[in-house]
């Protein structure tokens, strides 16, 4: 098996995602990763349900998923790529920067959000990604994000 094969992910269900990321309900924003191109790109999935706690107050009569949670889903999808590539238990992926964030359409209960994440560049433990969130192929949000890999004992 090649080094590339041992440090990249082909797809991931929720169990694998929870091994890669420290997030848990209600803040785990990725249910599944369906497509991965090594450490270059991935598509994460979030199935949006009315039972999620943020819908209690955002907004009770017309529930809309907060945009910041769409950004978090993008960051978690990118974080799974970073965590798997680094391949060392005990590392954390910290969300560092957000640029060019745009929210195009509301996301509501019943939607299936796809987080399309593409690596823009990597230098050492710093990663940069361009991310799009889509529902039924339509762009609902986009952003450029930065992440840093940090050893858990140094966090």
Swiss-Prot record:
Primary localisation category: cytoplasm
Keywords: Cytoplasm, Lipid A biosynthesis, Lipid biosynthesis, Lipid metabolism, Lyase
GO cellular component terms, semicolon-separated: cytoplasm; membrane
Reactions the enzyme catalyzes: a (3R)-hydroxyacyl-[ACP] = a (2E)-enoyl-[ACP] + H2O
GO BP field: fatty acid biosynthetic process; lipid A biosynthetic process
A Pfam family annotated for this UniProt entry: FabA
Subcellular location: Cytoplasm
Main enzyme class: lyase
Molecular functions (GO terms): (3R)-hydroxyacyl-[acyl-carrier-protein] dehydratase activity
InterPro entries: FabA_FabZ, FabZ, HotDog_dom_sf
HAMAP family: FabZ
Similarity-based family: Belongs to the thioester dehydratase family. FabZ subfamily.
Function text: Involved in unsaturated fatty acids biosynthesis. Catalyzes the dehydration of short chain beta-hydroxyacyl-ACPs and long chain saturated and unsaturated beta-hydroxyacyl-ACPs.
Name of the protein: 3-hydroxyacyl-[acyl-carrier-protein] dehydratase FabZ
């Amino acid at each position: 098996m090649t080094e590339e094969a041992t440090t990249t992910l082909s797809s991931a269900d929720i169990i694998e995602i929870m091994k890669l990321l420290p997030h848990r309900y209600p803040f785990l924003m990725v249910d599944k990763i369906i497509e991965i191109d090594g450490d270059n790109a991935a598509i994460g999935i979030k199935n949006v349900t009315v039972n999620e706690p943020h819908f209690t107050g955002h907004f009770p009569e017309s529930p809309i998923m907060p945009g910041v949670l769409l950004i978090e889903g993008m960051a978690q999808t990118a974080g799974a790529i970073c965590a798997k590539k680094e391949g060392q238990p005990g590392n954390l992926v910290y969300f560092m920067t957000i640029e060019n964030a745009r929210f195009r359409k509301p996301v509501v209960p019943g939607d299936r959000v796809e987080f399309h994440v593409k690596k823009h560049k990597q230098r050492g433990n710093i990663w940069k990604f361009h991310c799009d969130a889509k529902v039924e192929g339509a762009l609902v949000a986009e952003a450029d994000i930065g992440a840093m890999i940090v050893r858990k004992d140094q966090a």
